[in-house]
Amino acid sequence: PVEANTGSYANVTTKFNAITSSSTRGVLVSSLTTAQQALVTAAISTWVNDYDSITAARLLADYQAGYSSTYVAWANSSGTYSSAGPDITANGTYMRIDGPRVWIEIALQNGIVIQGQTHYHMMYRDKSYDYYDQLAN
């Protein structure tokens, strides 16, 4: 993309590299309180609920079963971790849910055409069912 390795995207890339090369992958979901785990489940549900209800329920159950190996990570626009959580309005904020199967990634950037307006780059992936491989079966 136009933003690659320039401006705010370079800052997000730097934060992503710092998170992925660190000794920790983030906060283990199974170590969170029940209420905090419910927030992770709600975030994942936003994506899987695009499927029919039977498929969505199956996927969500599989992802929840993997919470003992699922991590949540984020860096704020300053490039620092905050126990208060990510600032979902600030340019440069990066967030990720990474489990045995589920991968959700969100990066916030200022616009190129519309300056000063933050927009979101988001991605959802099921590592076992890429490209609808076996999901239909």
Model-inferred region functions:
Residues P1-N137:
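A cross-kingdom marker for long, charged
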